[in-house]
């Protein structure tokens, strides 16, 4: 029996987003480290706020970073 995902993003969509991130990056190692650092930051933020997130931090980081890549308008002008 197939296990259904609780999220609206499927595993194939996550893989596609990760491939898009890697192909858009000039350095695969650097983008991997950036995703890992963001996931680590999110994990500590969730831990401090006692928020029980259903999505793993790495998956959330991949989704956020790919959204920033495809939708630059969500990143505010600093």
Curated annotation (Swiss-Prot):
Enzyme class: transferase
Any one cellular-component term (Gene Ontology): DNA-directed RNA polymerase complex
EC number(s) reported in the record: 2.7.7.6
One Pfam family of this chain: RNA_pol_Rpb6
Keywords for this protein: DNA-directed RNA polymerase, Nucleotidyltransferase, Transcription, Transferase
UniProt GO MF annotations: DNA binding; DNA-directed RNA polymerase activity
Superkingdom per UniProt: Bacteria
Catalytic activities: RNA(n) + a ribonucleoside 5'-triphosphate = RNA(n+1) + diphosphate
Any one of the GO BP annotations: DNA-templated transcription
Subunit and interaction comment: In cyanobacteria the RNAP catalytic core is composed of 2 alpha, 1 beta, 1 beta', 1 gamma and 1 omega subunit. When a sigma factor is associated with the core the holoenzyme is formed, which can initiate transcription.
Role this protein plays: Promotes RNA polymerase assembly. Latches the N- and C-terminal regions of the beta' subunit thereby facilitating its interaction with the beta and alpha subunits.
Family per similarity comment: Belongs to the RNA polymerase subunit omega family.
Annotated protein name in UniProt: DNA-directed RNA polymerase subunit omega
Source organism per UniProt: Trichormus variabilis (strain ATCC 29413 / PCC 7937) (Anabaena variabilis)
